[in-house]
């Protein structure tokens, strides 16, 4: 398996099935801003609600091979082996990436257990060997990786964009970011000491960038302490 993240924004993705497994796939695709099409005679209440709200397209019938045409990615998420096989064949003929529930050997890709912290995306995969173990590891990450990591990721991204435009060497830029990561900034953010974190950013980047303006533009502003 080759680890990769896919940009599915606006791409047509097909889910065949209407139960709990299909529901999980649809939720993940919507989180990735994909254009989701669903084919199933029946839907779970949650999926039906999404269809009625217009968030997904729903064909209320059995799957036919033509459904695969134009799809970038396809999930076969039914409990019927013959349907799963039919979806697999149609996806392969259409040149789409395909994932077949409970058939890891037939899949072009596996869906990892995912932890999202805004723009920060962490995933755990076991190559299909044990989704349950992946879920346990994800839960452990969720306990250890708090919202302060997402805050730091936003901050670093906001600094990186203007810094890349400056006539500095690659090693010099890397050293600046390393000064950030080698500090206690994560702990400061975790403790609500945002003013201390902002002061450190100013100390590292203030001679190069308009740090105050950059910080004020972030959703985490104002950079004042939130804990006494």
Model segments located where?
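Glycine-rich, highly charged phosphate/nucleotide-binding loops
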Residues: 51-69
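E1/E1-like adenylate-forming module used to activate ubiquitin-like modifiers
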Residues: 100-150
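Hydrophobic, well-ordered beta-alpha structural blocks that scaffold small-molecule cofactor pockets
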Residues: 1-50, 228
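Short loop/edge segments at beta-strand edges and connector loops
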Residues: 40, 58-62, 102
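Residue-level detector of alpha-helix initiation sites
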Residues: 20-21, 81-82, 128
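Hydrophobic beta-strand scaffold residues
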Residues: 36, 58, 97-98
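ADP-ribose/adenylate-binding Rossmann-like module
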Residues: 73-80, 84-111
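An accessory alpha-helical subdomain
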Residues: 128-228
């Amino acid at each position: 398996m080759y680890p990769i993240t896919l940009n599915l924004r606006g791409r047509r993705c097909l889910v065949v099935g209407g139960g709990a497994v299909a529901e999980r796939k649809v939720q993940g695709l919507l989180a990735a801003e994909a254009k989701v099409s669903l084919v199933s005679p029946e839907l779970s209440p949650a999926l039906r609600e999404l269809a009625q709200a217009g968030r997904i397209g729903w064909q209320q019938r059995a799957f036919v091979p033509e459904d695969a045409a134009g799809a970038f990615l396809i999930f076969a998420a039914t409990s019927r082996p013959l349907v799963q096989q039919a979806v697999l064949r149609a996806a392969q003929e259409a040149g789409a990436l395909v994932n077949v529930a409970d058939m890891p050997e037939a899949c072009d890709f596996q869906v990892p257990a995912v932890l999202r912290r805004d723009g920060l995306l962490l995933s755990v995969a076991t190559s299909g060997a044990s989704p349950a173990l992946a879920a346990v590891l994800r839960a452990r990450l969720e306990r250890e990786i708090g919202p302060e990591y997402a805050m730091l990721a936003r901050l670093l991204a906001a600094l990186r964009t203007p810094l890349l435009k400056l006539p500095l060497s690659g090693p010099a830029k890397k050293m600046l970011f390393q000064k950030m990561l080698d500090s206690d900034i994560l702990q400061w953010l975790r403790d609500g000491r945002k003013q201390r974190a902002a002061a450190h950013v100013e100390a590292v980047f203030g001679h190069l960038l308009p740090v105050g303006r950059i910080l004020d533009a972030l959703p985490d502003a104002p950079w004042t302490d939130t804990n006494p």
